[in-house]
């Protein structure tokens, strides 16, 4: 089958079949409402980043170009083939993803190594999540969550009808042990550009708050649930949501990453619904501020553009992200996500005499007085 390469501004290459057929038919979305998804249950998670050499010799030994997409989040790496990394290299990948939030790898053969090899590589970071209603490949594994938007399947568009398609979130935060290091492989991107992923640093979202407000948030927990998402899918006739049903978990508002020990704001507007112990109106007020803080502070976010062979690796414990449906209806955006689950979120707590609080508070007081 013949293909054509589409060149868009910014030298992004996007291959397309001349007859309009998908480039990767084996990854077409398959929905089966009769399948039941079993809960993995509690498990002990050891983050591979603990074993990593902080100098990253195994990860970056073949790198030809490495640069930061923004000061606080995002690094693009050329010359490294993810499929060729050994265990030590994957450990270092986990560490760098935790430190930088999101990593972009170009010219990858990851798509071509097959379902089983993909799962084996990504399961290095934890047991793989199976989505409660999103599709998977008909001939592949349930762990592969298919990302698909095209004129022959407008379910993504229907799900976001009447709402902004830019919705900052952390995938599957209603799980008792939510995702950590996660992979997206883009198979086919819109011909007109667009379809990027936005990523925001939750570490910087936390640290950029005033010290007294940070202190107030620490020790709080919030309810995360997918109830709204399940209801929305049922509204559009998506019976596959009943494969798993409604999930709910209580997580700290501020967590600590198990490897880097950095504190991160762990709330998102898609799944976080209420701060425990607060009246609903009080909770809504605080959460609205935090959601706006995440969405509006572009000084700690980056934008991931896709091209053929791009793989995005990011740590969901220290980031929020969003899709962008900014391309014409009918243009194809096709990819898949593999999502390892990680540790139960670790709550952050600063004591009254914490040096970090005292130092930062003094800095803010000086700034306010000037």
UniProtKB/Swiss-Prot annotation:
**The UniProt record lists the keyword Acetylation:** no
Q: Where does Fe cation bind?
A: 169, 171, 321
What cofactor does this protein call for?
Fe(2+)
Q: Which GO terms describe its molecular function?
A: 2-oxoglutarate-dependent dioxygenase activity; metal ion binding
Superkingdom: Eukaryota
Return the GO cellular component terms, semicolon-separated. cytoplasm
The UniProt annotation places 2-oxoglutarate binding at: 197, 333, 337
Give me the residues that bind substrate, please.
Answer: 131, 337
Record-linked InterPro entries: AtsK-like, TauD-like_sf, TauD/TfdA-like
Which keywords label this protein?
Dioxygenase, Iron, Metal-binding, Oxidoreductase
Query: How is its cofactor bound, per UniProt?
Result: Binds 1 Fe(2+) ion per subunit.
Which pathway does this chain act in?
A: Alkaloid biosynthesis
Low complexity composition-biased segments: 1-12
UniProt-listed Enzyme Commission number(s): 1.14.11.-
Please list where the region (Disordered) is annotated. 1-20
Tell me the protein family, please.
Answer: Belongs to the TfdA dioxygenase family.
Q: What does this protein do?
A: Alpha-ketoglutarate-dependent dioxygenase; part of the gene cluster that mediates the biosynthesis of communesins, a prominent class of indole alkaloids with great potential as pharmaceuticals. Communesins are biosynthesized by the coupling of tryptamine and aurantioclavine, two building blocks derived from L-tryptophan.
What this protein is called in its record is: Alpha-ketoglutarate-dependent dioxygenase cnsP
